[in-house]
């Protein structure tokens, strides 16, 4: 699958992308999950990790495209993609 693109807007961030197979065919109906990365500090080992917190999900269209709108520009996010059809 292909890397995700992003665009920046004044009021927030619009994240949109296209999911494709290695042969460039679009992945139709793939589940796309948006997570906000929340820092978790482990006192015992004095290490900070990030845990994903679910925000929303969607499905890719016939061209393999998806889109999310985010208002919190100061946070980090993770996008997970799952192929429903297992081509």
Q: Which residues make up each language-model segment?
A:
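Conserved structural position at the C-terminal beta-strand
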Residues: 81-83
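Short Pro-Gly-centered beta-turn/loop motif in secreted/extracellular proteins
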Residues: 67-78
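Exposed beta-strand and adjacent loop surfaces of beta-rich binding modules
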Residues: 14, 29-31, 76-78
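Surface-exposed coil/turn segments at beta-strand junctions on protein surfaces, enriched
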Residues: 8-10, 59-61, 72-74
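Short acidic/polar inter-strand loop motif in beta-rich domains
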Residues: 85-87
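Short, acidic Ser/Thr/Gly-rich low-complexity loop/linker segments typical of extracellular
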Residues: 40-65
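Short, ordered, surface-exposed loop/turn motifs in non-cytosolic proteins
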Residues: 22-49
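Beta-strand-rich domain onsets/edges
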Residues: 1-28
């Amino acid at each position: 699958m292909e890397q995700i693109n992003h665009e920046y807007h004044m009021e927030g961030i619009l994240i949109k992308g296209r999911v494709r197979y290695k042969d460039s065919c679009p992945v139709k109906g793939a589940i796309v999950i948006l997570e906000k990365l929340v820092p978790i500090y482990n006192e015992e080992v004095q290490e900070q990790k990030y845990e994903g917190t679910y925000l929303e999900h969607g499905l890719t269209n016939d061209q393999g495209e998806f889109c999310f709108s985010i208002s919190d520009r100061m946070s980090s996010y993770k996008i997970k993609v799952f192929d429903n059809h297992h081509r």
